[in-house]
Amino acid sequence: MKFLELNKKRHATKQFTDKPVDPKDVRTAIEIATLAPSAHNSQPWKFVVVREKNVELAKLAYGSNFEQVSSAPVTIALFTDTDLAKRARKIARVGGANNFSEEQLQYFMKNLPAEFARYNEQQVSDYLALNAGLVAMNLVLALTDQGIGSNLILGFDKSKVNEVLEIEDRFRPELLITVGYTDEKLEPSYRLPVDEIIEKR
């Protein structure tokens, strides 16, 4: 599917049918999503595919988001790794000499952790939010490309997600992404004309 067509086809899917979503399709979409760029190639994301605990997770969603999560066959909880130094070292460890030169291994094992050590709390938060947004957009496009609907949800109680899903506290919940099929005819949302958002200097 051409990129323009793919973007025009993607809409927020808020009501789902009972049609199950194949776990292989979800895995494929996540694999494609991780081709997204990330600052320093740090890839600080973690995906939790929720099926069995969807009802419990839905209770943490605010307002109409409760219905969306409750009815979705699958919800993907997107987390980011707040221990950026550990994440950098993991990339070096998992990638190893087969994928990295000695210089690159040094970068992930020592240089990058030293860089992250200089970040204050706000810088870490901004860094994680940016990278989460990049991979989340790739994920919904990858799902759309397979004919699967999705919606990005920000309104939920982030303070309780780790406990409900049994995820280590070092991982920060960013988004819930509901996933499934719909029989609704979805219409595009209004977009500002491009000249309204461009300035030239």
Regions found by a protein language model. Give the residues of each.
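Acidic, surface-exposed loops and disordered segments
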Residues: 1-201
